[in-house]
Amino acid sequence: MTEPKFKTVFVFLDTDKYCSPFDMLVAVDAFPDSTIFKYENVTGEDAARIVFDALFPRGPEGAKHTKIFINGSNFDMVAEVVAATQKCMMSAPWGNSIIVDPRGAYSTAASAVAKTLGMALGKGLGSLEGKNVTVLAGTGPVGQIAAKLYASEKANVTIT
């Protein structure tokens, strides 16, 4: 008997009224044979039901091919969906991959911090610990996350 072949499935949970096509297009380009299920206006309660239903039908092997992508412009609502998703994952002996990137803020901020750190190391300046870092226009989503990431590197952070 041959092993079942699982198709890659992305379950997009978006807290906004409309799910942004940006990440769905990136997913389809990276995995052309994938399937995307999108859910909009998702709350923590909704997420628990959706994720629970996505956990079990494919078993542990199929779970490796099922990704949960959490998105939205409201960080608090996204955090609620993430918490509900993580709690739901505890109910199974396996879990799905979870990707969290509210409107690209996490990936953009992480890229900026990684680039800064790489430049500092490349110039022989060492780590960011104790260095002064200014995040320009840092009150938006990307700036807020970048400031937290710089602080986690023990940099002295100023937000303008």
What spans do the regions from the language model cover?
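A glycine-rich, Thr/Ser-enriched phosphate-binding loop motif common to dinucleotide/cofactor-binding enzymes
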Residues: 99-118
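Glycine-rich phosphate/diphosphate-binding loop of Rossmann-like nucleotide-binding domains
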Residues: 119-160
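Gly/Ser/Thr-rich loops at beta-strand to alpha-helix junctions
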Residues: 17, 73-78, 104-108, 138-143
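Glycine/charged-rich beta-loop-alpha catalytic/anionic-binding loops adjacent to active sites
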Residues: 91-99, 129
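Short, surface-exposed connector motifs at secondary-structure boundaries
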Residues: 63-65, 94-95, 151-158
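Short, well-ordered amphipathic alpha-helices
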Residues: 83-86, 113-121
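Extended hydrophobic secondary-structure segments that form protein cores and membrane-embedded regions
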Residues: 68, 99-102, 132-137
